[in-house]
Amino acid sequence: MADKGNFNNIRQLCLRLRPILGVRMDQIYAAYLAEDPDGREQIEHYLELLAAKHIPQSLGQEEAELIPPSQEQAQGEYPLGQVLYSGKHLYPFGLRENEWIQHMAILGRSGSGKTNIGFSILKTLVQHDKPFLVFDWKRNYRDLLAWPEFHVVEVYTIGRSIAPLTFNPLIPPTGTDPKTWLKKLNEVIAHAYCLGNGVLYLLQQAVDAVYEEAGVYDNLVQSWPTFKDVLTKARTMDTRGREAGWLSSTLRALSSLCFGGMGDLLNSSSNRSIDHILDGNVILELDGLSQADKTFFVQACLLYLHHKKMAENVREHFDRCILIEEAHHILSGQRTSLTGAESVMDTTYREIREFGVSLVLLDQMPSKLSGFALANSYATICMSMSNRADINAMSQTLLLDTGKDVLGTLEVGQAVVKLQGRIPRPFLISIPEFRIEKGRVTDEQIRDYMKDKMPQLGTEDGVSDGTVGEEQEPMEKGDGGPGNALEIAFLKDVVDNPDSGVAARYKRLGLSGRQGQKLKTGLLDQGLIEEQLGTTQAGRLMTIRLTEQGRQLLLNPGE
C-alpha cells in the first residue's frame, strides 16, 4: 500500500504548481493516483523537475505554502492589489460588493504600507460612489484633496479651529430611548478614560438628573443639555466615603470633556453638524485631541451612527464605509478582558454590518485588538510584522500553522490575505504604490477649501420642538406636493446624466447628502424612479433610471 504521507506531499506539490501551470496539474495528479508504484515514481521525478523549473529556489517554504486562488476566485469589483506567487504578479485581487459589510482588518508594523492601501480603498470607493468616513489620527489623508476625484471630500480638524465640527453625544439619535442611550454612552466614557464601576454609577446619576431637568424623558426639550451641565451637576453631588473617591474620578473625566478643543467640540446644543458628516465623504483629523479624547470621540460617533442606522430601512446592503486608524484604542482586547464581557464597541462592530456599514480597521498591534473584532472581520490583510506577539496573533487569525515566519519577511507593499469565504486558504498579494505628495495640503488650504462646505449649525437653541433625538432638516425647495420643482429637476438630471453617482448628482442639484437621500427615497416611494446595478466606465455601479410613471410626469409636469 502506498505511503499516505507521500500522496499528501505530491498533492501539495501539485497545488503549488497549479497557479503556474493551470489545469494540467489536475490531470497529472489524476494520472498519479491511477498509476502503479513504478509509474508514480516516474511522475514524482517529473514533478520535481517542474518544481525546480517554475518555483524559484529562493522561495521559502513558508511563502510556498501561500497557494494563490484561481483568477476567477480572485476577481472582485473593488481592486486592492495583484495576486503574487513565485515572484510573479498573476492577476488582480479585489473585494466584492457583498463582502464589504462583513468588515476588514489591515494590520502591519509602522511603515509596512497600511496607509497606502487605505488610500487605494478610498479611491475605489469614490469610483463606486460609496460614501466613506475616515478617522485620521495622524493627518495622513488630507493630501488626497490634490487628486481631482477627491474634490467631493470634506476635511474637518477635530479640536482645532481650522475646519471645526460640533457633536453633542448627549443628544440621542432618532428613535433611541434616552435611558438606553445614557447607559451605552457612559460605558464609552468609562472605556476612554479608564473609569471603574463606581464612577459609572455617579455618571449615570448625574446625566439622569440633567436629562430629567431638561425634559428629555417627557419629550419637552427646549435646549439640549451638554457635558458642562453634567459637570455642574456632578460638582453638587453629596458623596461620602468611597463615593468621594469615585466623584474625584468622575470630575476628572467630565473636566476633560469640557476643556479646550474637546469642550468646543462637544458642548453644543445641536447635532446638525454630525448628522451632516455621516451622509457624505468625510475625513476627520483627530491630531488636535489627546489619546483618551480621540478614543471617546470615535467610539461616540460609531455608537451614534449605529443607533441612527437602526432607524433606517437599509439592511445588509453595502451603504457606506468607515476607516479607523489605531483601531486597538477603539476595540481593545485588554478592556474586554477587564470587564469580562463584550463591550459596547464590540457589539457595535458585530451588529453594524446589518445596517449596510463596512468597518475597515488599520492597526500595527493586532495582539492588542479585541478578539471579537478579529473574529468578526471577513477580510484580514496582514502586512509585515516585527513583534513576536503580533506574529503569533496573526498566524492564528490567518490559520498559518507552519508558515507564520513569512509575516516577518514581507516587503513593503506585500500582504498575506485571508478571506472567511470564497478563498479557503491565505495567499500573498502585492499592493501598488499610491503616489501622493505628503504634506502638500496646508491648514490654510483646508480653511479656504472648507469655508463654503461646513454645515450651517444654526443657533444654539438646537432642537426646539421637544422631540427626543429628532433630526433638524432644512426646508426642501418647491411647494412640497407631487411633482414639485425639485423632483422635476431630479428627474431631468437622471435623464441628462444616467450614469452619474449620487454624490455628483446631489452636488449639481445643490443638495446636501441628507437632502438628496430624502428626495431620492421619496421618488422611489412614489414609483417615479428605480435603482439598477449596472456596468459603467468606472465599474459596476448602482444607477438610477426613470420608471414609465416618472417619464410621464417629466413629459407632463403640470398634470
Regions found by a protein language model. Give the residues of each.
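Conserved P-loop NTPase motor module
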Residues: 1-21, 25-32, 36, 216, ...
